[in-house]
Amino acid sequence: MSAFTLASTSGGARAGILHTAHGDVPTPAFMPVGTKATVKSVDPDELRALGAAIVLGNSYHLHFRPGEELVAELGGLHAFMGWNGPILTDSGGFQVFSLRDTLLEADDDGVTFRSVYDGRAERFTPELAARIQELLGSDVAMCLDVCAPPGVPPAELEEAVQRTTLWARRQRDLPRAPGQLRFGITQGGLDTELGRASCRERVLYTV
């Protein structure tokens, strides 16, 4: 069965169902952010009562504290959080590229940055991002991408799209947690053609 079922459309809008190992998610959906494996001031029972269908966890922060290996030893992110519903983890790319003061270098192999926790130089690659999320055991893992800020020159925006595609290709067939989906991320900023090209490529690397 496909991971996504289209339920209905109206003009350019559509509604569907995302099928994951821990349940279905009606879309469009509001996704509460549990950056460090918890939604601030809301416990799992309250999340369920509020009707949350899926929760987001942040790979960047979980990698540094407490670490994906410890989360795996404790049974994975669902057990660690006390949440038995679907979980999506981002790749850490947004944090790396949006915290511009900590960014040191980005190339086709990966990105080097300073940790916001202790200032040490760290290196993220597509392979590491995939491994972190495999150990976390989320239902949906996101590919590492280059998040270009608004207003960058066209050449930099195009480079971000090309590098995001290159990284998605490398991640497509890497190991995943049982039942884990892996989605690519579309880049291109406000450039319609770049966005369309990125979207077409991303469909090929979503598994």
What would you call each of these model-derived segments?
Residues 1-176:
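Non-catalytic, usually N-terminal nucleic-acid engagement modules in DNA/RNA processing proteins
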Residues 3, 162-165, 171-200:
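Glycine-rich phosphate/ribose-binding loops and adjacent secondary-structure elements
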Residues 201-207:
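Positively charged, low-complexity/disordered segments
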